[in-house]
Regions:
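Short, well-structured alpha-helical interface segments that form or flank functional binding sites
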Residues: 137, 201, 314, 318
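Long, charge-rich alpha-helical interaction segments
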Residues: 197, 204, 208-298
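Soluble catalytic domains of membrane acyltransferases
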Residues: 3-197, 206, 304-305, 321-439
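General structural signal for secondary-structure boundaries
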Residues: 94, 215-223, 266-273, 300-303, ...
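Membrane-proximal, non-transmembrane alpha-helical segments
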Residues: 263-342
Length: 439
């Protein structure tokens, strides 16, 4: 492993830990060095490799789009185990360039390292729970590595799926699912007889495995419909409205089964499905016009929001949140404004803010902590502990901000007559129970 990767890894792990409220890994790889090519879904751009790298035991090298490798960034990306992959739209001889990259991949696999590849090649502008058609690169690289070693070493391919409740929302949740690996050595005879066919067949097999690790909606235009059913039922992967009695894994499985059920209506759509879709659309449009969130309406309907407990939490967190604001708020505002102005595609915002935050907040606070430690005549280790605690103070600030926002929203909603919306929601709950199977 390169030294910068080793140094940055614990900081990135902390950043991911702070960003997501809960992370669950299913079938996590057992070994750090196992010559495996991980084929992952690309739902959230730069966030995907960050969360996989920090929640996977394996030492990973990342295949990254070549246009981010500039004169300035190339040394840093190299140090972070990133390798460029060239696409036709990059305006270069992709075959020649990728041959060089494939050789580096072969060298990494020969050294018992692992690769993380995103065969879809791109990320949707808007977060959608689906897998786009994948390319053959992962399988091709695996067989190139096997030929280079004269088939003496085992090379594996495994599907990995990142399931976000919402990737750009801090304190949301994430479930990472890993498939059992495919050993490419088992296909030597077929490969030597007809390499093109075997690569195509195995790519299809990997695509099926990748879909099994995530929620996959065939019809892109039904993504909103799928999300709305999850919100009303409370059983799915929505990050705001969900039943807390269901574990994240159960909610993920519900999301998958719901999508698979909707995918069965590829040709003829039953009248009751179209009717439900229309009713949901009307309900959420009225919520939007009223500037009300469904989670708040549900809390009011169920009388589940306790303003007193929320106020106690705010008071308890206030001293720590104040320290968090003093140490982090100004850099945070700079990062937020810079990222949202620089990157037009919002899919990049969450990961870029997280990475920039890790570096800029550290650079901003190191001299402050050093001066404080010296001024108060404290030993180095006290300053170090305080520096680490700054991230917890910032988390307190984020938590108190969310609680205050909820308090303001709930105070506002209490003044509204929401009877009509409550009745609409109750009717939708009943309709979903009647129409959607009990998964």
């Amino acid at each position: 492993m390169r030294i910068l990767y080793v140094i940055v890894y614990p900081f990135m792990s902390l950043a991911v830990f702070l960003f997501y409220r809960k992370i669950v890994s299913i079938n996590k790889p057992k070994y750090r060095f196992n010559r495996t090519i991980y084929a992952g879904n690309h739902a959230a751009s730069f966030m995907d490799p960050l969360v996989v790298a920090t929640n996977n035991r394996s030492v990973l090298y990342f295949m990254t789009r070549s246009d981010v490798f500039t004169t300035f960034s190339k040394p840093f990306l190299w140090a972070f185990h990133m390798l460029p992959i060239y696409r036709q739209q990059d305006g270069v001889d992709t075959k020649e360039k990728n041959a060089e990259v494939f050789q580096k991949c072969t060298d990494a696999l020969a050294a018992k390292k692992n690769l993380l590849i995103y065969p879809e090649g791109l990320t949707d502008d808007v977060f959608i729970r689906r897998l786009k058609p994948i390319k053959k690169g992962a399988i091709r690289i695996g067989f190139i590595a096997l030929e280079a070693s004269n088939w003496k070493e085992k090379v594996y391919v495994s599907a990995i799926g990142c399931n976000y409740t919402y990737p750009n929302a801090m304190r949301s949740e994430l479930l990472i699912s890993n498939s059992d690996p495919i050993c490419l050595n088992d296909y030597r005879t077929e490969y030597e007889a007809n390499s093109y066919q075997v690569i195509a067949d195995l790519t299809d097999k990997v695509e099926v495995l990748m879909k099994a690790q995530i929620t996959h909606i065939e019809r892109e235009e039904w993504s909103e419909f799928h999300e709305q059913i999850m919100i009303i039922s409370g059983k799915g992967m929505n990050y705001l409205t969900y039943d807390k009695s269901f574990s994240l894994e159960l909610r993920w499985k519900y999301s998958q089964k719901l999508a698979n059920w909707l995918n069965t209506f590829s040709e003829t759509i039953p009248v009751e499905i179209e009717s439900l879709k229309s009713q949901l659309s009307t309900y959420f449009e009225q919520l939007k016009n009223s500037e009300i969130l469904d989670c708040d309406l549900k809390a009011k309907k169920d009388n589940s929001y306790n303003s007193f407990l929320n106020l106690i939490s705010i008071i308890a967190l206030f001293p720590f949140a104040t320290l968090g604001a003093l140490h982090c708020y100004l850099p945070y505002r700079f990062i937020k404004n810079f990222v949202e102005k620089k990157f037009k595609r919002s899919v990049f915002w969450g990961s870029t803010k997280m990475v920039l935050g890790m570096f800029i907040l550290s650079l901003f606070n190191v001299p402050i902590v050093a001066v404080l430690t010296n001024y108060l005549d404290q030993p180095f280790w006290i300053g170090l502990i305080y520096f680490v605690l700054i991230s917890m103070f910032w988390l307190s600030f984020v938590s108190i901000k969310l609680k205050i926002n909820q308090f303001v929203r709930m105070s506002k909603i209490k003044r509204f007559n929401t009877n009509e919306l409550v009745i609409m929601r109750q009717e939708l709950e009943e309709r979903i129970l009647q129409i959607v199977p009990k998964f």
